[in-house]
C-alpha cells in the first residue's frame, strides 16, 4: 500500500475492474491454491490452526500442517541419532493428531515434519510444494519478545514465495474463527485493488462486513519559514479535492461489490497512511485485514511496501498480505532450494 491518492485516470474509471461480483470467485482469481500452517510446539499453534482452516474452508484449498524440528541451539555438537529419531517420530505423531482432530471441518488436511533451520526449511518446502499462503504466528517456540516479530517469523515473511496470513500472538484463541469484519486498505492503485476478489470471497464465506479504507494524505509544501496565507489555502484546496476524489472512488468500488454483502467505506485525513490505517484498525477492531504487499509504488527491491511493513511490525489483528514471489530473492532461492539437505548421522562419528 502507498500513501497517495487516486490518479486522474482512476477518477474517470479508465482501468480494469478487478472485482468479480458473483461471489463465486475461483482460486484462479484469488490465487491461493495451497495453504501451509506453520505449527511449532508453542501454545501459539492453537492460534494458527483455526485461521488456516477458515481460509481452507472459504477457498476450497488443501492445507498442510507443517512442523520443523530443529536441533537445540547452542549445543555445539550434533544430537544423539537415536534421540533425534525419537523427536521426529513424536513430532509426526503430534501433528497427525492435530490434523485428525480437525478433519471433520476441513477434510483435505495433510501433515509434514521436516528437519533443519525453521525459516529456511519452511521457505524451501513452500517453494517446492507450490504453497501460495503461509499461515504463521508472530512469535513461536522462542516466546514473546519486545520486537513486533519473532526471528523465525521475520525470516519466513521476508523469504515467503506467496501470501502471508500473520496471526498476532496476543490475539484471542478460539477453536473456530469467524471473521465478522474484514478491513481492506485501498490507495487507488490496481495493485491494492487486486486483493478485492479474495476479500469478497472471504466475506461471502463468513457473512462478514467489508470495510474499505482510504487515507487522504496532507499534501507537503516546501516551507522556508511560516507558510503564507496563499499556501495554506492551496493546501486546504488540495485536501478537499483529494477527499472528493477519494469519496467518489470508494463509492464506485462499493457499488461494484456483489449484492448481499454489507459494505462500509471509511475516509481518513492524515499526514501518513501508516498511522492512519493503524488508527482505523484500532477503532474498527476488524477480525481480519486484507491488503496487498505493495500499493502504488510497488518497488521490486523490497518484499513489502512501507505501509504493509509497518502493519506487519505493529500487528494487533490478523493480517492477510497478498504478494507475489519476491523477485529480488528468485535467483538465489532457485539455485539453493533443491540442494540436498544436511542430515544427521545415522551412527556415532
Go through each PLM region and give its residues.
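A short acidic, glycine-rich active-site loop
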Residues: 82-93, 232-245
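A cross-kingdom feature marking solvent-exposed beta-strand/loop segments within repeated
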Residues: 74-83, 120, 143-144, 148, ...
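Short, structured interface segments
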Residues: 153-172
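General small-molecule cofactor/ligand-binding pocket signal
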Residues: 64-66, 110-114, 165, 211-213, ...
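Short beta-strand elements of ligand-binding domains
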Residues: 137-138, 164-169, 292, 319-323
